[in-house]
Amino acid sequence: MCNDDTVNELKKDFHYTLSKFSHEIRNPLTLINSGLQMIASAHPEAEDYEHWDDVMDNLSYVRELLDELSAFNNAGRVKPEATDTGMYLKTVLSSVKPTLDYLDIRLVTDIPNDLPTLMLDRIQIRQMLLNLLKNAWEAVPVPGGQISVTAFTEKSGICINIQDNGCGISKEQLASIFQPFFTTKENGTGLGLAISRQVAEAHHGSISIESTPGPRQTHE
């Protein structure tokens, strides 16, 4: 059985390896992307090539994967600051409202003004919330989708409930939903929910999902 020192050393090695891997991949990826942009600039007809969009989409996917690997690597290391949680949540939700309006998805919110001030890493909590909201809006029907977000004080913290009228997932999928790289989406990285759980736990919280096949899914 590993002792705490061994576990911590393994974690440090893992974080270092993941960071180095991301760095080593990102540099040539940037050069490839720049090279393709130069080709397109010098030879506009290149964009008419039938697989050009596929190439650019794949590059975008790898960039997104590297960004999420970096977020996953840093999710447990927080820089908390005193945060008015009510105002903060309203700001985050306002930032996604234009996207949801464009997609014709209704956003219903109930965020009290008297939520407590908490020590939060605002960048990481924002990413966690955006991951959960993105999961919701990708699951709901368009048009006709609805996402409800409520928050309330619970013990020494708050509970945030995100509910949607999407298609839901099976019990088997639910058992693996927080595992890194597990995804039910064709172009998903499978890291969003794993990152979200790490962020919640780094703030001494937890995250859970209730879902069954059919409409209605809840994140807390």
Regions found by a protein language model. Name each.
Residues 49-99:
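Conserved DHp (HisKA) dimerization/phosphotransfer helix of two-component histidine kinases, i.e.
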Residues 169-181:
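Short conserved segment of the HATPase_c
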Residues 101, 106-116:
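Conserved catalytic submotifs in the C-terminal HATPase_c
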